[in-house]
């Protein structure tokens, strides 16, 4: 039964965008398309290497900006702020954990990939293990994950933001943003994607900083956040329940390993396994590092991205918490009828925390800037995923089906596959709307925890254990897929109960946190890989040479001409600079973890 504790009508009409706001949005889009067209014109787009890897001539700063922007799509803006509103600071651990795996990408994985001379991640798997079935499986799995955890989420989040801010039809908003995003992605390849990502990063950070300052002004500063958040209770609640009460551990990063929503054990071990898949083996991310002109630029890009990944705690998570403080009846609603009124979803409305803050706090002009920021986030993420997914399909699937396909055919297929991915993703949006208690970010991580750990296990063992072979790797992937897919299907068949209802889900769902499940799935898959490899013949020499950490090629592209002593000294100097920055970065990361622990 719902209980109404309000003393007045708390639901006033929201503010709307003005002509000035819309003009700023239009100017931003014009600038964005201009950057895309400029980079497309200067790019080498008529070869597969130029279209998919930007000619391998990118410097560190656009790589770092693109790594950050690619991971900070509108789904993450809305998802992180929404999870912050629902549960507090701990969700920022998903961002801070990236520091260590980004450094692993640059110092461990990229040298392996450069040594193996590959374009896609499944291509590396084929070279390392031999055969075609692992490469084909990983290509298909990557495309499915792109649809279920990336494209559909970003489309939903971006359309939700535009729907709330502009009042446009939800699916009309989706189509318009897709059309603009696909325009320069299809035209310009990876070069256009990386340069527009650099612009998006600047806009995203600037706009988010302004909103964060405005939000803290409303509650009296950071010192007031903990007390204000603890009192952010909606006026209408469900009797005899506590789901409307903010978490007591909301201001802590490390939480109870048994009862917490984000246990510290899962955030330390399970998250690292999932993050290693995303940052070190996922095509969307690795493709940016492979476009670097040399190893130092790849390292510099990872370091810049790692520094930027420290920002979302203050720019997304805390503003989400403040949004619940300011608008508890909308962002913190628990009564289904109230949630339906506030955001159109009965399960909860934490996803509207960020757009609600934008529309209610930002003055005219800046409101338009923030809508542009969210569109920038959407387009940055989508352009990255579109380009990388088309690379996967073209290089790993189409060339297998059509081995004699020419450059023109491959480029055409790469562009057409984007259209197909978009159609499937739009069709999936209604499914994810009601998933995982209305928390978009948790839905994304939950799906990843069921499918990604086996891939991480196969990559890690392939790089560090020379004895791993094709039979062990394939059956490790199949065992992991069987177990992970079973849990995933159960999650869709048995969604989390709404507030006030008993939890009747199977024990594997309510008794095993998805982050802990990721650890178990990783260990299971790894054990099958080891057992299968030991019971079958050793891999051939061609599957080891230049393809493992212990057999790296000695002539990695360092950007130094043979015999150029001065260039060699410069390279060594910048290598030391990268090393010092990596150590400093880890110190900063540990300090923040300790401060908020």
UniProtKB/Swiss-Prot annotation:
Location (main, coarse): membrane
Extracellular side: 1-16, 95-100, 163-174, 223-265, 323-367, 432-444, 494-514
InterPro entries, alphabetized: Na/Glc_symporter_sf, Na/solute_symporter, Na/solute_symporter_CS
Residues that carry a glycan: 5, 97
MF terms (GO), sorted A to Z: D-glucose:sodium symporter activity; fructose:sodium symporter activity; mannose:sodium symporter activity
Membrane topology reported for the UniProt record: Multi-pass membrane protein
Cytoplasmic side: 38-73, 122-139, 196-201, 287-301, 389-410, 466-472, 536-576
Subcellular location: Apical cell membrane
Regions crossing the membrane: 17-37, 74-94, 101-121, 140-162, 175-195, 202-222, 266-286, 302-322, 368-388, 411-431, 445-465, 473-493, 515-535, 577-597
Keywords, in A-Z order: Cell membrane, Glycoprotein, Ion transport, Membrane, Sodium, Sodium transport, Sugar transport, Transmembrane, Transmembrane helix, Transport
Record's GO cellular component terms: apical plasma membrane; plasma membrane
Tissue distribution of the protein: Predominantyl expressed in kidney. Also detected at very low levels in testes, skeletal muscle, and spleen.
Recorded catalytic activity of this chain's protein: D-mannose(out) + Na(+)(out) = D-mannose(in) + Na(+)(in); D-fructopyranose(out) + Na(+)(out) = D-fructopyranose(in) + Na(+)(in)
Domain of life: Eukaryota
Family assignment from sequence similarity: Belongs to the sodium:solute symporter (SSF) (TC 2.A.21) family.
UniProt cross-references to PANTHER family, sorted A to Z: SODIUM_MANNOSE COTRANSPORTER SLC5A10, SOLUTE CARRIER FAMILY 5
Functional description taken from the UniProt entry: Electrogenic Na+-coupled sugar symporter that actively transports D-mannose or D-fructose at the plasma membrane, with a Na+ to sugar coupling ratio of 1:1. Transporter activity is driven by a transmembrane Na+ electrochemical gradient set by the Na+/K+ pump. Exclusively recognizes sugar substrates having a pyranose ring with an axial hydroxyl group on carbon 2. Has likely evolved to enable renal reabsorption of D-mannose, an important constituent of oligosaccharide chains of glycoproteins.
Protein name stated in the entry: Sodium/mannose cotransporter SLC5A10
Organism field: Bos taurus (Bovine)
């Amino acid at each position: 039964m719902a209980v109404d504790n309000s003393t007045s009508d708390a639901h006033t009409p929201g503010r709307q965008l003005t002509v000035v706001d819309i003009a700023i949005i239009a100017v931003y889009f014009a600038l964005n398309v201009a950057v895309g067209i400029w980079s497309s014109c200067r790019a080498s787009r008529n070869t597969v290497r130029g279209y998919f890897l930007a000619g391998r001539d990118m410097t560190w700063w656009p790589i770092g900006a693109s790594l950050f922007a690619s991971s900070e799509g509108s789904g993450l803006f809305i998802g992180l702020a929404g999870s912050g509103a629902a549960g507090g600071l701990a969700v920022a651990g998903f961002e801070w954990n990236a520091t260590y795996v980004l450094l692993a990408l640059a110092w461990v994985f990229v040298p392996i990939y450069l040594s193996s001379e590959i374009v896609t991640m499944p291509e590396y798997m084929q070279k390392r293990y031999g055969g075609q079935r692992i490469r084909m499986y990983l290509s298909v799995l990557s495309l499915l994950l792109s649809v279920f955890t990336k494209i559909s989420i970003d489309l939903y989040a971006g359309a939700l933001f535009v729907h709330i801010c502009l009042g446009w039809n939800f699916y009309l908003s989706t189509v318009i943003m897709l059309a603009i995003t696909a325009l320069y992605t299809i035209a310009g390849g990876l070069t256009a994607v990386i340069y527009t990502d650099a612009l998006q990063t600047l806009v995203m950070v600037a706009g988010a900083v302004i909103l964060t300052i405005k939000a803290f002004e409303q509650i009296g500063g950071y010192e007031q956040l903990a007390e204000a958040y603890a009192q952010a209770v909606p006026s209408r609640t469900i009797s005899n329940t506590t789901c409307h009460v903010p978490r007591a551990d909301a201001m802590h990063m490390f939480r109870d390993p048994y009862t917490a929503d984000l246990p510290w054990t899962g955030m330390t071990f399970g998250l690292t396994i999932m993050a290693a898949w995303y940052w070190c083996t996922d095509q969307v991310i690795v493709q940016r590092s492979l476009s670097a002109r040399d190893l130092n630029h790849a390292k510099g890009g990872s370091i810049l991205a790692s520094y930027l990944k420290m920002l979302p705690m203050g720019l997304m998570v805390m503003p989400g918490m403040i949004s619940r403080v300011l608008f508890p009846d909308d962002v913190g609603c628990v009564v289904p009828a109230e949630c339906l009124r506030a955001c159109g979803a009965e399960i909860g409305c934490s996803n509207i925390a960020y757009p609600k803050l934008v529309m209610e706090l930002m003055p005219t002009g800046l409101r338009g800037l923030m809508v542009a920021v969210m569109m920038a986030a959407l387009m940055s993420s989508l352009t990255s995923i579109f380009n990388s997914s088309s690379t996967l399909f073209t290089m790993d699937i189409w060339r297998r089906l059509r081995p004699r396909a020419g450059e023109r055919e491959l480029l055409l297929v790469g562009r057409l596959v984007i259209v197909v991915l978009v159609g499937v993703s739009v069709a999936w949006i209604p499914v994810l709307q009601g998933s995982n208690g209305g928390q978009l970010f948790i839905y994304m991580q939950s799906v990843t925890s069921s499918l990604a750990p086996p891939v991480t296990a196969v990559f890690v063992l392939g790089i560090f254990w020379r004895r791993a072979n094709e039979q062990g790797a394939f059956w490790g992937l199949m065992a992991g897929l069987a177990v992970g897919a079973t849990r995933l299907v159960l999650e869709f068949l048995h969604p989390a109960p709404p507030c006030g209802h008993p939890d009747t889900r199977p024990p594997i769902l309510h008794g095993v946190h998805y982050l802990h499940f990721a650890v178990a799935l990783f260990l299971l898959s790894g054990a099958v890989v080891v057992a299968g490899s030991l019971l079958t013949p050793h891999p051939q020499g061609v599957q080891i040479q230049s393809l493992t950490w212990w057999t790296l090629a000695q002539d990695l592209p360092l950007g130094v001409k043979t015999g150029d002593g001065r260039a060699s000294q410069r390279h060594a100097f910048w290598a030391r600079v990268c090393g010092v920055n990596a150590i400093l970065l880890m110190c900063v990361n540990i300090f923040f973890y300790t401060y908020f622990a």
